[in-house]
UniProtKB/Swiss-Prot annotation:
It comes from Influenza A virus (strain A/Goose/Guangdong/1/1996 H5N1 genotype Gs/Gd). The active site is at E80, D108. Belongs to the influenza viruses PA-X family. This is Protein PA-X. It is found in: Host cytoplasm; Host nucleus. The record marks R195, K198, R199 as: Important for efficient shutoff activity and nuclear localization. The probable endonuclease active site in the N-terminus and the basic amino acid cluster in the C-terminus are important for the shutoff activity. The C-terminus acts as a nuclear localization signal. The C-terminus is recruited to host protein complexes involved in nuclear Pol II RNA processing.
């Protein structure tokens, strides 16, 4: 699974996921299903934001990669992927500027057009089940919820899907592709089933000679990214700016 993740996802996504896991004492090389889930959720958040801008009239517009529109404002502020301190700083700044209610939990995005925080979910189960779980946890009508599944289903607060159909189809296609690629490598069953994942983890640890003296139970600490999912491509023009904002790269 680790090899698949590194081959399948943008290097920046992988780096952000590794950073989030290590912050909570989790090892991406061992908890590989969690690694894949975090990467998937991060990429969906970035894809949700890609190419969506607000023009000088305050209207939402879609600008494909390569068009020189530096003066346009990005419609979505990406909160997911930042360390917790910076993420809350961004949230507080948005609340102070816009007057919106501060959420109890860190959301994934902020929509400057609709003036609301957005919680993104990516589920391997039925979308309505996961939607209800997330809604019960957040307990706030102010935060908009949008759930995607690997089967092409989606569910959103008041059936308001925020994005145009083409943008959502791009996300669904990417999720379906990830599922197909996992299945072709024999990884999908363990990704979906916790029992199968635990069996595979024990097998991997044994093959690496790491079982002796180590608990086989996986850590229950939850990474910030994993809190927003259960357990795709990016706008290349935005990658450099995001990297500068989200990561402090070490010189090798």
């Amino acid at each position: 699974m680790e090899d698949f993740v590194r081959q399948c996802f943008n290097p920046m996504i992988v780096e952000l996921a590794e950073k989030a896991m290590k912050e909570y004492g989790e090892d991406p090389k061992i908890e590989t299903n969690k690694f894949a889930a975090i990467c998937t959720h991060l990429e969906v958040c970035f894809m949700y934001s890609d190419f969506h801008f607000i023009d000088e009239r305050g209207e939402s517009t879609i600008i494909e990669s390569g068009d020189p529109n530096a003066l346009l404002k990005h419609r979505f502020e990406i909160i997911e992927g930042r360390d917790r301190t910076m993420a809350w700083t961004v949230v507080n700044s948005i609340c102070n500027t816009t007057g919106v209610e501060k959420p109890k939990f860190l959301p994934d995005l902020y929509d400057y057009k609709e003036n609301r925080f957005i919680e993104i979910g990516v589920t391997r189960r039925e979308v309505h089940t996961y939607y209800l779980e997330k809604a019960n946890k957040i307990k706030s009508e102010k935060t908009h919820i949008h759930i995607f599944s690997f089967t092409g289903e989606e569910m959103a607060t008041k059936a308001d899907y925020t994005l145009d159909e083409e943008s959502r189809a791009r996300i669904k296609t990417r999720l379906f592709t990830i599922r197909q690629e996992m299945a072709s490598r024999g990884l999908w069953d363990s990704f979906v089933s916790p029992r199968e994942a635990k069996r595979q983890l024990k097998k991997d640890l044994k093959s690496q000679g790491l079982c002796a003296g180590l608990p086989t139970k996986v850590s229950h600490l939850i990474s910030p990214a994993l809190k927003n999912l259960e357990p795709m491509w990016m706008d290349s023009n935005r990658t450099a700016a995001l990297r500068a904002s989200f990561l402090k790269c070490r010189k090798k």
